[in-house]
Amino acid sequence: MTNVGEQLKKKPMLRGGGFTFKQFFVAHDRCAMKVGTDGVLLGAWVPVEKARKVLDIGCGSGLIALMIAQRSTPEVMIDGVELEPEAAQQASSNAAQSPWAERVHIYQQDVHQFAENHLHQYDLIVSNPPYFAPAVACRDEARDTARYTGSLTHDALLNCAEKLITEDGIFCVVLPHDLGEELSRLAVQQNWFIRCQVDIRDRPGKPLHRILLTLSRQAGETEFQQLDLRQSEGVYSPEFCALISDFYLNY
């Protein structure tokens, strides 16, 4: 006879108001920006093997921090900093209800103040940063803060990362492709080195639309990669499936 309890343990129950992953749930109904492919890409891709202390700048719902917690060893500690109060509270709640409650800590604070006052440095910093210029006012103030660069320009983001990163640390971001190239140029001007660049498109023949970057203060060759999220017929590519298989249900 099938044990229903064992079935429930193996397959997470779907819940509303958020996104159910294999090992955790991310509530995002109080966050301006919801769980999306950008955050999932960064959380699944970022190198965690050498990380011991991690910072997620603009952590939103806490998605990326929780993905890194799942992928990393138990001694790795992860901090998230988030300006918007509702999002920070929800990220704290998501972390508290996850299997890694003791390892993930959320700070509701402006990252500029955080960078000035925080005593710790991080060997891995990640960010899914804002990317719209505030030329047109957004109808939702929280969403405006989450996705417009008015509160965190790329120049300011790099400056904050410089203050918070260890000498050998890496800084990883995901952005729309054109803005990622702009950030790359700005980073080089500020004496960062591009150590890895992943150009992303939806499927073969489509234009590049996202970019993953690894920046470092240490010189080294740049590794260039390309990722198609889907195959020509529209199904997820084997490469993308390999990234998400530990997280997405049914993969």
From Swiss-Prot:
Gene3D superfamilies: Vaccinia Virus protein VP39. It comes from the Bacteria. Keywords: Cytoplasm, Methyltransferase, S-adenosyl-L-methionine, Transferase, tRNA processing. It is found in: Cytoplasm. It is an enzyme of class 2 (transferase). GO terms for cellular component: cytoplasm. Its main location: cytoplasm. The keyword Transmembrane does not apply. One of its GO terms (molecular function) is tRNA (adenine-N6)-methyltransferase activity. GO terms for biological process: methylation; tRNA processing. It catalyses: adenosine(37) in tRNA1(Val) + S-adenosyl-L-methionine = N(6)-methyladenosine(37) in tRNA1(Val) + S-adenosyl-L-homocysteine + H(+). Its EC number is 2.1.1.223. PANTHER family: TRNA1(VAL) (ADENINE(37)-N6)-METHYLTRANSFERASE. Belongs to the methyltransferase superfamily. tRNA (adenine-N(6)-)-methyltransferase family. Specifically methylates the adenine in position 37 of tRNA(1)(Val) (anticodon cmo5UAC). This is tRNA1(Val) (adenine(37)-N6)-methyltransferase. It comes from Yersinia enterocolitica serotype O:8 / biotype 1B (strain NCTC 13174 / 8081).
